[in-house]
């Protein structure tokens, strides 16, 4: 079998290429999932051609099971159809089947599925929060959150995370369950997603206090999931937002992993679908260009600041960071009622998603271009933001 070499994304190691379909390898040390892959189709593929390809995969996989006893591979699992055109699927295939798929001229690339996780790093109960006051003030140290009374009303926020406690008093009936793409437990059994949702749109803790929340579960009780499952959640949010009017929708992803072209492409598809997407930069104190989906340039990537307007010690940085937002010692909702304090870029990102919902509620245009509006409104106050990193901290423009 002949192999040729082609250029591949910088963050990925050299890999096999067959008839134009790249089989991408993740970096050393990344926790890949054995025999699980994400297959992304060529740009512009029609639904008819995609259905034909999927039928071929299923037929070929079944024949392999019968004729060759291809282990206990389960074949195709998830199918992705973003409204802006990205199509693909994930599944459990042996090496020979993946090589057969890679021979197809209609395949753009194949990527090994890998683990992703939440980006929160510590927890402390029942201490005061400061993030809201900082978003509504030009100076640090405030205790009052100033905001327009529209407060994101009529805007839907998709929180792609561990799920959301939709019955929590913070949401006053404004939260609904969207879907579960990781397990069979339709609740937030971790707490991370509820905390994030509270920062986006909680009555007490939220930036956009009247926005609606849709909980999309892609991470399990341990705060862990896979790129393939996360992409399913992203696809759901994009398609659901299209039904409801994408211009009045925002999404938040306080999660991430090592660089993944498929994850980045899915994030770009959300933006292309007209949905504003905020993503946590990551908590490894490294360049966020190494992480996904934080490294996707068409979304809004958020680093974490401290109460003293410094870079949080854990926060990733770099040119892909669009803005800073409060992320150290943030109080928000926890499942079952009450509150808890978490730190991380996971806590910074929902401040930006909430601000996006808030600004749409005041009449500003939504979609990915809203990130530019947020950057233009931000104040340049972050000390030591990191090499090549913006020093801008978000502000809601209240004038206080």
Swiss-Prot record:
Disulfide bonds: none
GO terms under cellular component: extracellular region
Protein name (Swiss-Prot/TrEMBL): Subtilisin-like protease 7
Function noted in UniProt: Secreted subtilisin-like serine protease with keratinolytic activity that contributes to pathogenicity.
Subcellular location(s) per record: Secreted
Domain Peptidase S8 intervals: 129-400
Residue ranges of every copy of the Inhibitor I9 domain listed in the record: 36-118
Entry's family note: Belongs to the peptidase S8 family.
Propeptide section residues: 21-119
Glycosylation sites: 252, 396
InterPro entries: PCSK9_ProteinaseK-like, Peptidase_S8/S53_dom, Peptidase_S8/S53_dom_sf, Peptidase_S8_His-AS, Peptidase_S8_Ser-AS, Peptidase_S8_subtilisin-like, Peptidase_S8_subtilisin-rel, S8pro/Inhibitor_I9
PANTHER family to which the protein is assigned, alphabetical: CEREVISIN-RELATED, PEPTIDASE S8
Alphabetized SUPFAM superfamilies for the sequence: Protease propeptides/inhibitors (SSF54897), Subtilisin-like (SSF52743)
One Pfam family hit: Inhibitor_I9
Signal peptide extent: 1-20
Keyword Transcription belongs to the record: no
Residue positions of the active site: 161 (charge relay system), 192 (charge relay system), 346 (charge relay system)
